[in-house]
Amino acid sequence: MSLRALRILISAALLSGAFALAQTQSAPPAQTWPAVDGTVVLNNFRFGTGESLPQLKLHYLTLGTPHRNAAGHTDNAVLLLHGTGGDAHSLLNPLFSNVLFGPGALLDIKKYYLILPDDIGHGQSSKPSDGLHMKFPAYDYDDMVRSQRMMLDEMKIDHLRLILGTSMGCMQTFVWGETYTGFADALAPFACLPVPLAGRNRMMRYMSIEAIKNDPAWMGGEYTSEPKQGLHNANEMIFIMGSGPLQMQKLAPTREQAEKYLDDHLALADSRTDANDLIYYVNASRNYNPDPHLESITTPVLWINSADDFINPPELGIAEREVKRMPNARFILIPISDATRGHGTHTVAAVWKDYLADFMRETEPKP
């Protein structure tokens, strides 16, 4: 693979989601999956702030066919949740989908019914850039999870075999486990911690938000063209948050290569990002806090982080402490290696698929 092709490949992976970053030196060719588009409209959706929207549109993709057991309940539905700034299509990344969705794979679409939503504020779902700008309701992860559950109700899905969430979706998976106990057979949160976002994590998010708000061109969110400097500075911070040190050093071993790669990546990121949308989805984590009620998560949990995750650094020791509070949870810390990709390891399914295979066998419902 040429260096130019390598850079294009990694840029595409990085841009699959702002924090949902998957860096790679090589990847299988993308497959064309028979994804079916769907949309539900939730009327008079009320947010945790008390704000409401007359109509909240939620877009999603599905793969496979739903199946119902003898009691009439869905028994093969899998909910896959994307990261901050991503969308349903980001989980069609070949590093993820080629490993998991094909014939005989762990989430073979001939066996499972995969549901990939665009979260509030993302993709083709309702978001600030649709027109409300900073008057859009200030959604948070609780709102997102509640809307996901309402979407499933509209789809007539009354049970899930698995919820697998990456990054933001990882945090939402913990919220699911507390809020809708028993709705899923198994929970797989990848690349997060079940505690409030504070310390360096919140500082970096706050810096990204303030970079935009402090740009005079932002105009309180009523800009007619993107606030370029503020948006650029925000994307710089987000890039560093999701990067992995080993792969960045391999990719850009000289000063010239490092600067060119960063310039190329940011030019693409800036062209694809709306400033108001970024403010909202980065700030959606502000109220996240499953910590007080972790003991209520009795569903089996497979929780995986990687040692080179800059957003969730293992030296904090939080995961090892918190996993003990969930009665059926297992935490795995994947050591840094040539295979890991920083925070984006959550999308590189080859790294953790064997753990998921064991977990799926262990949680297979008994007849």
Positions of predicted regions on the chain:
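Catalytic-loop region of hydrolases
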Residues: 23-77, 88-89, 367
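N-terminal cap/lid subdomain of alpha/beta-hydrolase-fold enzymes
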Residues: 61-130, 318
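Conserved acidic catalytic loop of the alpha/beta-hydrolase fold
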Residues: 142-162
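Conserved hydrolase catalytic core segment
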Residues: 159-201
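Alpha/beta-hydrolase-fold enzymes
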Residues: 183-268
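Conserved alpha/beta-hydrolase "acid-adjacent" motif
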Residues: 310-317
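Catalytic active-site module of serine/aspartate enzymes centered on a nucleophile-bearing elbow/loop
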Residues: 328-367
